[in-house]
Amino acid sequence: MLFRSPGTAPYFGLAWMLAKNGLSIKDVKVVNLSPQAAANAMIAGTDGVDAAMTYEPYLGAVRAKPEAGKIIATTLDYPMVMDTFGCTPAFLAANPKAAQGLANAYFEALDMIKAEPKKSFEIMGADVKQSAEAFEASQKYLRWQDRAANQKFFAGEHAQFSKEAADLLLAVGIIKAAPDMSKLADPRFIK
């Protein structure tokens, strides 16, 4: 199994998917590769590569070459990795308007994706070195979480997810102690 080093999102994703299926990291032979290199090794049919952990846009390359391998599961099946932005407590205390601006900008970007998808895909594609068309194709496998979805998540799902994630990270040795769950998120900026 090819994956990124311990503590990274691909490592966590692999550990999460394995745990949800009664397995652990100890049940697979692992090789540390970046998500892009892992996808490339899978596509190339590299000897000894039976599985790889990767993400978009590299997952799209695997999807485009089904003879090289089958996508078993994604974060659409196991929603445990999300793009977030975070600020230190000191920054939030000193700059609440800036933090609110970050949150508002995210939701404005979602509005732009709906109102001007082509322009949005061009901007986002340029950031990850993809054409607008390629980004549009790969973003179909993402979930854009609007304000209501964020509010729902932080109203209850976040606490349960954080507990499960902490238990898993403890079990695989990434963390030595569970964090104070009450200090993991400050959802006031999404209200």
Can you annotate each of these PLM segments?
Residues M1-R63, K118, A159-Q160:
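Bilobed "Venus flytrap"/periplasmic-binding protein-like clamshell domains
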Residues A93-I174:
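Secondary-structure end/capping motifs
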Residues K163-K191:
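Conserved C-terminal helix/tail region of periplasmic/extracytoplasmic solute-binding proteins
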Residues V28, F135, P179-D180:
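Residue-level detector of family-conserved "landmark" positions at structurally sensitive sites
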Residues P35, L76-D77, D186-F189:
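Residues that form or immediately flank small-molecule/cofactor binding pockets and catalytic motifs
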Residues T88, D146, D186, I190:
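Residue-level signal for threonine
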Residues A37-D127:
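Pocket-lining segment of extracytoplasmic ligand-binding domains
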Residues A19, S24-K26, K129-S131, I175-K176:
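Short coil/loop linkers at secondary-structure junctions
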